[in-house]
């Protein structure tokens, strides 16, 4: 293992202490035992910043070529994405997220099992892996005004307050296709995957529902009790149960999808935000309007990353036809952990 710093003095692993095997002016290397295809906990001691201190790391060690071979074996001539090999290389991650995958990606450390097919919907893909882990892909580009917005809206604010790791995570929201890893409460995922996918931990039981349609679908799926904040005011809410809860202050209005009240989200312990696609520019938007909308979207996702609240945009209304729109209930079933339930 090599650290990009010359200040590391030792590493603790498997109950033993290991000293540098090599050192340069900019790095320190150690030879340590690890278990393959499993998360390994190590502790490194560094004298950087004047004071000696230990830092705990989790590393996942694998043979990349084996993963690529597995992907090729089920590709049937199609391109297969391998998630977990790009690390912090955001340019490669962005390239892999320009379009939705036709074949389930190979995810380092996870075993692919099945796909929930979308017969009509065009803007999402759902792939299932072991441990009950699911990969959800959502197309954030097709039939939007994103192209008109240009590229300058992607430039992160210098006052965003995000550290380098958070900046990497926030950048995932700027991809044309966003990949989410839906992870059950007790499941363990390989270290480093959060650099390439947005991790949504279940249970998502303090949900912000950004629209009446989201509220309605959650009620049909029997998940209304998970809604704690909403994006519609009481006088515009069409759900009587939520209106009553708002009157009792059990459910709080936390701003619209395009203008969130972050303090209220934090106060109500929001752990998942389901936004309407109104946060994206419409296809015929002017350059100015599209840029303004995408800039606001970027700033919003930066803040939500800082607050550790995953954001999922519901593009059901952008689908063509009622059958395609209805199929988005499959997305809700996955993210809310109610796969066996169907909307009436």
Please place each PLM-identified region on the residue numbering.
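Short, ordered beta-strand-loop transition motifs
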Residues: 22-26, 125-132, 140
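Short, hydrophobic/aromatic-rich segments at coil-to-beta transitions
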Residues: 40, 130-135
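Short Lys/Arg-enriched alpha/beta "domain-start" segment
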Residues: 87-118
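A short, structured surface patch at a secondary-structure boundary
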Residues: 134-138, 145-146, 150-153, 157, ...
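Charged, glycine-enriched surface loops/patches
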Residues: 284-337
């Amino acid at each position: 293992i090599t650290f990009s710093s010359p200040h590391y003095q030792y590493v603790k692993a498997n109950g033993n202490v290991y000293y540098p095997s090599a050192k340069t002016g900019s790095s320190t290397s150690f030879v340590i035992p690890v278990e393959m295809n499993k998360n390994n906990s190590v502790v490194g001691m560094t004298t950087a910043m004047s004071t000696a201190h230990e830092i705990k790391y989790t590393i996942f060690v694998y043979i990349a070529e084996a993963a690529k071979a597995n992907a090729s074996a089920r590709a049937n001539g199609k391109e297969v994405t391998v998630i977990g090999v790009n690390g912090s290389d955001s340019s490669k991650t962005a390239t892999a997220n320009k379009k939705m995958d036709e074949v389930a990606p190979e995810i380092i450390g996870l075993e692919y099992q099945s796909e929930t097919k979308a017969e009509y919907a065009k803007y999402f893909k759902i792939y299932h892996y072991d441990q009950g882990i699911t990969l959800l892909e959502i197309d954030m580009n097709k039939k939007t005004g994103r192209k008109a917005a240009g590229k300058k809206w992607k430039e992160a604010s210098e006052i965003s307050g995000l550290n380098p790791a958070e900046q990497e995570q926030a950048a995932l929201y700027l991809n044309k296709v966003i990949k989410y890893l839906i992870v059950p409460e007790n499941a363990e995922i390989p270290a480093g995957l959060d650099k390439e996918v947005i991790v949504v931990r279940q249970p998502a039981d303090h949900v912000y529902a950004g629209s009446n349609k989201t509220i309605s679908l959650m009620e049909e799926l029997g998940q209304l009790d998970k809604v704690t904040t909403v994006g519609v005011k009481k006088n515009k809410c069409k759900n009587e149960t939520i209106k009553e809860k708002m009157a009792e202050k059990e459910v709080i209005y936390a701003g619209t999808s395009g203008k969130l009240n972050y303090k209220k989200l934090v106060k109500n312990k929001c752990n998942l935000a389901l936004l309407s696609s109104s946060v994206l520019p419409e296809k015929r938007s002017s350059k100015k309007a599209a840029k303004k909308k995408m800039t606001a979207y970027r700033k919003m996702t930066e803040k939500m990353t800082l607050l550790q609240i995953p954001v999922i945009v519901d593009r059901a209304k952008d689908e063509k036809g009622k059958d395609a729109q209805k199929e988005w209930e499959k997305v809700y079933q996955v993210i809310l952990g109610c796969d066996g339930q169907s909307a009436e």
